[in-house]
Amino acid sequence: MEQKTFCYNCGNYGHIFKNCHYPIISLGIICYHKLNDEYKFILVRRKDTLGYTDFIRGKYLLNKDSILNLVNIMTIKEKENILKYDLKKLWDELWTISKDEHIDEFEKSKEKLDIIRNNGIEEQNNGIKEQLKLVDIVKLSNTKYQDPEWGFPKGKREKDENNLEGSIREFEEETNLNKDHYKLLNLKPVIENYIGSNTKKYRHIYYIAKLLPEVKIELSENNIFQKTELSSIQLMSYEDVVENIRPYNKEKLAVLESVIETLKYLDEHKIDL
């Protein structure tokens, strides 16, 4: 029997990821805990920023705006690192245990980095040509982030997974929880749509779950995924989320506000899902 082509992005059959017309999709769970009439939500902080990750992978065009878009997302330390260290060191620290899976990207990324570090790229400034090197572009960045982005646990689907299956697996990998620690609510998932700094369209699909009592939220030394992908995990109130979410993540806050309104309605009407 002929095996059907599976799209790892949308989960449909008949085409592959690069031919998918949907936004780039991630799947996850927004999990809440209620204590003293206050809702708190599980958020995770990445090990590296999205801008830094895309830069190390060479996911940019050889022009100022494309590179600066990524640099502006980076932490202060990441900006220092891309100027200070060779790509091999940065690459190995980024991927840790899975670096061989992305080795095909390494040479292309190294070629780009050599160009912008050594030769620079030609840009027009008020009609005058100038050569900008990476160090010049980093100097143009005025962001001063200390930590990588916070967000809800999520990730990409695996082979033959539907939305719910992928959401559960990603959530459990990132939180180190299992089905005995939370209860999925019988609600339609909430959708977060946005356009990234790379001008691509993204869609995050979140199911809603309730954290069961007495469950601890913490990083585990025995969880390889957490050790290599995350730098922190916390239960946050809405005010905490507002304080920690980056200013350009307005869509994420809108999704959270929608979830809170739904939870309040369920509580007020004593609806148990």
Q: Which residues make up each language-model segment?
A:
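Short amphipathic alpha-helices and their capping/turn residues within compact interaction modules
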Residues: 12-15, 34, 176, 180, ...
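Extreme N-terminal segments of fungal proteins
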Residues: 23, 36-38
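Short beta-strand scaffold segments in enzyme catalytic cores
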Residues: 27-31
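A short coil-to-beta-strand element that immediately follows conserved catalytic motifs
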Residues: 178-189
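Conserved Nudix-box catalytic region and its N-terminal flanking loop in Nudix hydrolases
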Residues: 39-169, 173
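Nudix hydrolase/Nudix homology domain
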Residues: 9, 18, 71, 83, ...
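Extended hydrophobic secondary-structure segments that form protein cores and membrane-embedded regions
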Residues: 41-47, 187-190, 206-208
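A short, cysteine/histidine-rich metal-binding "knuckle" motif
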Residues: 1-25
